[in-house]
Amino acid sequence: MKVFSHQDEVEFISDDSRECTPKSAFLLTQSSRVYEAAAREKGCKLFLEPKDLHRFLKTDIPLIGVTGTNGKTTTSAAIYSILLDLGYKVALLGTRGFFMNDELIEPKGLTTPPLLELYERIDRAKRAGCDFFVMEVSSHAIDQKRIEGLNFALKILTNITSDHLDYHKSLEHYIQTKNSFFDDSTPKLINKDESKAKFNLQNALSYGIEHPSSYHVKAYSLHGGIEARIAFLEKEASLSSSLFGKHNLYNLLAAVSAVHRLIGGELQEICDMAERFGGVEGRMERVSEEPLVVVDFAHTEDGMRQIFESFPHQEIVVLFGAGGDRDRSKRPKMGAVADRYAKRIYLTSDNPRSEDPLLIIEEIEKGIHHCQKCVKEPDRVQAIRRAVKELEAQEVLLILGKGDEAEQIIGSQKIPMKDRETVLSALGEIRGVR
């Protein structure tokens, strides 16, 4: 990637040796360092470490980094929304793309982009006059040092459960990677109910529901949305939201706590702004009310459990698969949690990539003891159509795994499809017949 510099001594900075010239600087990252000699052959004379980028790009903007297995996207989006509604100029970078001041600037890509691209986004936000830069921080980015050299104003932990073991190889390494983000003295906000959290106590505040914490929920109701009473020291505030589920109470609590820690002010005013946040597309998105159909990105055992527990008074029907060429150990666990909560299970594809979709389904099925519940249909579109058609009035259909993704990866092909649109099409056909 090529990023133009604000200093006359360098025309541009690149992490690709093939782009280098005598007037460029080459960024030495964990992945690009092996190409240093190739950059020299191109005539490049200036070599930069990530900490040097502050000399050439504008990065002096408060950075808020959110990490965790689940909840990063919703928590980040809620912080972004609250700050915007309070009148600040804000940038947001994450799974859904790069946003500035309620405008989509770049479409979705990696949760946390490569280091030079990330610095370029921060530089662009600073030049646009943004007061804050909110970003999701993935475990891959922490491990690959894609956030090296950045000075965060606040770091936030949502939770830690099992994920990405295809990359990290063990749960222990995954947990260590997440926790390493909180090793320094940077101001931090930690989920006190997360038993796996390990962090530097300096400048640490916490939030929680079950355990005493800096920001804590004194009482709450999850019937028909969220109603909660939040306390911080001697201050109390009421929080209302149309979002569903205890996991979203955690997400909103983290967001409210983060904004209060960043700007101070009245806790109640921040809660009032949080009430305006309508959620994120593909995250507990109610595509239809009658029948009730919900689309969500949940793709881990814990993420699925949180969704299931958000519907304690309804009969649950679930449709999901598991990503190919990814952590295989979680597949039977996903099957087991579905077996525990769901009345009927539709097993299908979720980006099978190079794997055989039927073999992935078989691995999920190993965790399901009541196999009579299962319907196996590897074609995700057909599975959704069938699930919608067979849905009964007292049931809720939860379509999990892909959220707002707009394509299905099969082999090397990316085939356009979106769960939400497939549901609406199926409902349209049913209503047309009736």
UniProtKB/Swiss-Prot annotation:
It comes from the Bacteria. GO terms for molecular function: ATP binding; magnesium ion binding; tetrahydrofolylpolyglutamate synthase activity; UDP-N-acetylmuramoylalanyl-D-glutamate-2,6-diaminopimelate ligase activity. It is found in: Cytoplasm. InterPro entries: Folylpolyglutamate_synth_CS (IPR018109), Mur-like_cat_sf (IPR036565), Mur_ligase_C (IPR004101), Mur_ligase_C_dom_sf (IPR036615), Mur_ligase_cen (IPR013221), UDP-N-AcMur-Glu-dNH2Pim_ligase (IPR005761). The gene is murE. It catalyses: UDP-N-acetyl-alpha-D-muramoyl-L-alanyl-D-glutamate + meso-2,6-diaminopimelate + ATP = UDP-N-acetyl-alpha-D-muramoyl-L-alanyl-gamma-D-glutamyl-meso-2,6-diaminopimelate + ADP + phosphate + H(+). Carboxylation is probably crucial for Mg(2+) binding and, consequently, for the gamma-phosphate positioning of ATP. Keywords: ATP-binding, Cell cycle, Cell division, Cell shape, Cell wall biogenesis/degradation, Cytoplasm, Ligase, Magnesium, Nucleotide-binding, Peptidoglycan synthesis. The keyword Cytoplasm applies. A motif (Meso-diaminopimelate recognition motif) lies at residues 350-353. UDP-N-acetyl-alpha-D-muramoyl-L-alanyl-D-glutamate binds at S17, T111, T112, S138, Q144, R146. Pfam families: Mur_ligase_C (PF02875), Mur_ligase_M (PF08245). This is UDP-N-acetylmuramoyl-L-alanyl-D-glutamate--2,6-diaminopimelate ligase. Catalyzes the addition of meso-diaminopimelic acid to the nucleotide precursor UDP-N-acetylmuramoyl-L-alanyl-D-glutamate (UMAG) in the biosynthesis of bacterial cell-wall peptidoglycan. The modification N6-carboxylysine is found at K178. Meso-2,6-diaminopimelate binds at R326, D350, N351, P352, R353, G401, E405. Gene3D superfamilies: Mur ligase, C-terminal domain, Mur-like, catalytic domain. The keyword Transcription regulation does not apply. ATP binds at G68, T69, N70, G71, K72, T73, T74. One of its GO terms (biological process) is regulation of cell shape. One of its GO terms (cellular component) is cytoplasm. NCBIfam families: murE, PRK00139.1-4. Its cofactor is Mg(2+). Pathway: Cell wall biogenesis; peptidoglycan biosynthesis. Its EC number is 6.3.2.13. It is an enzyme of class 6 (ligase). Belongs to the MurCDEF family. MurE subfamily.
